[in-house]
Amino acid sequence: MSIELVNVSKAFGETQVLRGLSERFAQGEAVCVMGRSGLGKTTLARIVMGLEKPDAGAVRGAKGKRFAAAFQEDRLVERLSAQGNLRFACGAALDEPRMAEAFAAVGLTPQDVEKPVGELSGGQRRRVALLRALMAPADVVVLDEPFKGLDEAARQAAAAYVRRMQAGRTLLCITHEEGDAALLGARVF
């Protein structure tokens, strides 16, 4: 089932960030929400997920869906390792071989994933947060600036893993980078 925005508006004080926005995100579709900083892209994602209420309009089809997200601030548990962060978010059902494959796919070494995430670089943390969202049991995955701070090789590897892990789930990628849509094979909105 798709998620539909119908005439959604949102303001913060005097600043109108969304005005009469209507759009449909089909189940299994990859969409990049594009635009420069401050245009309301993250606010739109938060409204879709039910974390913010629109001032006007409605979101249809989101109720009952499971969401996973990697926002710009990673919100990882500092004292846990990369492995621990995935287990914490995804549950005990996440097995070692699947985790090892995921870490390798985005260029994290076995040594990297055993360290507390507080000791990892920004790019490494970004990849852990990305995996946490992708591996969670979710119908909709929201990735806010998912490749920010990654070098080109890491961007390519991470994007390939995102495409592989999408697997019928709706993907909303929030970005201002035009190349992200091409990397993900996503529709631009």
Regions found by a protein language model. Give the residues of each.
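Helix-to-loop junction immediately C-terminal to a conserved catalytic motif
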Residues: M49
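Conserved ABC ATPase "signature" region
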Residues: E96-D112
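Conserved ABC ATPase signature
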Residues: P116-L120, Q124
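Hydrophobic anchor residue at the start of the ABC signature
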Residues: L130
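Conserved signature/switch motifs of ABC ATPase nucleotide-binding domains
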Residues: A136
